[in-house]
Curated annotation (Swiss-Prot):
GO terms for biological process: tRNA splicing, via endonucleolytic cleavage and ligation. One of its GO terms (molecular function) is tRNA-intron endonuclease activity. This is tRNA-splicing endonuclease. Belongs to the tRNA-intron endonuclease family. Archaeal long subfamily.
Amino acid sequence: MNLLKTQLKGDRVLAGKEAVAELYKTGYFGRPKDDGLELSLVEAAYLQSRGKLDIELEGKLLGFRAFFEQASLRQQNFELKYIVYKDLKERGYYVQPSAADFRVYPRGSHPGKSAAKIFVHVLSERQPLSVKLLQESVASAENVHKQFILAVVDEESDLTFYEIKSASPKGEMPEPFPAVKADATFLEDRVIAWDAEASGALYSRGFYGKMLDPERLQLSLVESLYLFSRGVIVVRDRKGKIFSFDEFVEKASEIEGSFLRKYSAYKALRDSGHVVKTGFKFGTHFRVYRKVESIEKIPHSEYLVNVIPEDYEFRLPVMSGAVRLANSVRKRMLFAVEKGEEVEYLDIGRVKM
């Protein structure tokens, strides 16, 4: 059998005009050029492994091993991209290289018939992932109406696919603020509201805090500052001195270094109509409810939320654990990216391709 003759040039493999009919028009491999067909390194490796072509470098024929080693020298993450490309092809997708790594066409479609629907970015489980770059990649995909998929290759070359999208969660809770300012005391690492009427209203209609007894309400630090900022409670120290907003923030930040970041996300979620409670049992900052109609019949929370700074770098094993836990308890995993007074959300979930 005569194989197509190709040449390795830089980070591309070049084939003659006959390859256009044999490879592009039948399988949509490569990109037609005036003098033939240009293949990416992963496309060429895939085709070579299936006995479709010979690859030469400076007149020397390269076997699969030699070409794979050359390709790995010429393109960062080549072996990872090859693993993902091969997997997607074997699932029946048409796949083409892109700036994101790959663009993937819907099953039953191909280039020329419809547009690609998915951008796939490839990483090793050991590589950090910048939140800033991730948000830019997701925005670029969403701006052209594409789904953004992160393909993570673990040390045993198994693949996990994550869909990542921006989110704008909206809740349905009215704010049941009492008409009076309730007195509260900042103890060691929490606040207690003493007014029975205000405590009952905040707990039963807004799911704030936890009742210490039938008349008094325990509040977390973020809950307390939010209610303080709304003029619902007056917070004093244990000697009776009234805190200013800045004094409260300073004391809370001494207790918890990331307090102000957590508060920014808490405030954004409450302002958008959600009930926000601690996510400690799930290993996250918050669990979030879209609506709680009755304390006696609390529904399942919709989201788990971790709050991160905009210069954060994901460690993929940690991200994987958070997403897997959220999926296992039928919740969405949101990462709230704190940007000063603004909060943006990334919704990350595992998907099957």
